[in-house]
Regions:
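FMN-binding flavodoxin-like domain, especially the glycine-rich phosphate-binding loop
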Residues: 24, 55-177
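N-terminal beta1-alpha1-beta2 submodule of the flavodoxin-like/Rossmannoid cofactor-binding fold
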Residues: 1-72, 167-177
């Protein structure tokens, strides 16, 4: 049975990755707005994508609140965001703790992809949060490399999306089918 890709996007990166994944796997990519958990029961593999906002995966409750109903499914979660790859280990631990209160079930695989930030497209709430983050990080006495990078990113557009990043996810799903 074919997998399905579900995504919840705010600025477009997650949708773009979701469509790339669906294209490579020969399946559908569907906006999470139009999906109910009952729709997912027909699939063996569910691939869910959401952007990271303050360490929370956008829309992840579709999966986390229904893990009991999806327990027999292979679940792959992908995130999009601006966290540098050399800081992922620390950040991933925080993301998992914030989104999976009881830990990640064995049948859930998580992948992280670089996203984009176009300052003009941000909502006023996100622009305000970016300014506050920059001010907070810039005021630190001994900022980490990640904090320095985040301060730098606050002033510039950046599109780090890269289709090549999905290759491990594709291999993983194809190996499970």
């Amino acid at each position: 049975m074919k997998p399905i890709v579900i995504y919840k996007t705010k600025y477009g990166s997650t949708k773009e990755y979701g469509e790339w994944i669906a294209e490579d796997l020969g399946c559908s990519a569907v906006d999470a707005k139009s999906v109910k958990v009952s729709d997912l029961l027909a699939y063996d593999t569910i691939i869910y994508g959401g952007g990271l906002y303050a360490e929370i995966i956008n829309g992840i409750t579709l999966i986390t609140k229904n893990l009991d109903k999806l327990k027999d499914k292979n679940i792959v979660i992908f995130t999009t965001g601006l966290t540098p790859s050399d800081c992922r280990d620390y950040y991933d631990k925080i993301v998992i703790e914030r989104n999976f209160k009881t830990g990640v079930p064995d049948k859930v695989k998580i992948c992280n992809f670089p996203g984009k930030m176009m300052l003009e497209e941000l909502t006023i709430v996100h622009r305000t949060a970016i300014k506050a983050l920059k001010k907070m990080m810039a005021g630190k006495e001994n900022p980490t490399e990640m904090e320095k990078l985040l301060v730098e990113l606050c002033d510039h557009d950046g599109d780090f999306s890269d289709r090549a990043c999905i290759s491990d996810l594709i291999k993983y799903v194809n190996g499970r089918e």
